[in-house]
Structure formats: structure tokens, C-alpha cells
């Protein structure tokens, strides 16, 4: 085994204080890539689109419902974060965000007295995490909801197996749907 084939990742059980309970998420804390020292290999920059297939491969190998990759954004106090299932990148994952914050505080990368600001890779949403009274408070952005009408609404009703005799008062989607 060569040193470049050794990678550290965390498995965090979110929403619980009990081992093997809650909702597990994988977390990898990556360097920013300035020195070539990252979690993704010697020359892989986590903010480079060319590394997305590597992140996808790692998430498939970890094989949890979601794996979060996070790194300190260049020239910023924020942390970038991307989320992958074993098969696809997703825009947002609450329990993986919680898990990433827990790892950053627990490893000492961020003092527990400081809030963490994450910026998502898909959609560029800002997420904030802070420790308050021994619990993690997460603040997610409000999303603008748009009404779903016409053919799109009919497709949605069909997907749920609902017929015309079901009264739907409204259907909405967010900007990332």
C-alpha cells in the first residue's frame, strides 16, 4: 500500500448520541489543494470539476446514503461542501452537514466557540452551524417556492398515483428542484 492510497474519512451518526443509531453520513475533510495535500490524491483540488468523479468514486466505496466533502474555501472563512450519494451528487443534505460540522469541531479544525459557514457546491447556498447549549443549531436559507401548474402539475399527480378526484390545493417546487 502506498501513502497516497491511504485516506481518512469519518462515519458520523447524526441525530443521536448512541453509536450505530441515528442517520449515518460519511465525511471527508480535504485540504484546499494549494500544496497538493488533499483527501482526494496528490494533485486533486477539491474545487476543481475534474475531481467530481473522484468524489463520486469515494462516495460509492464508502456506500452510505450520503458522503460530504468539505474544505476551507480559498481566501475565506467559509467551508465549501459537496454531497454525494453512492450514485450521484446532490444539492443539499441536512444530516451530512450536521456530521461535517461535528467533525470540524471535534477535530479542532474549527474552535467549538465559532460558528461554521458552509457554501454548497450545487446552488451556492449558505448554511450556518453553531453550537448552542450542547446542541448544534443549523440555519438553512429560505427557498423561493414557485407554483407548479398545467402539464407539470399533471405529471406530479401521476407520479403519486393520484387521479382527478383528488383535490390538490397547491404544488410547489424550490429553485433546486
Report residues per predicted region.
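Active-site proximal loop and beta-alpha junction motif in alpha/beta enzyme cores
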Residues: 2-92, 98-177
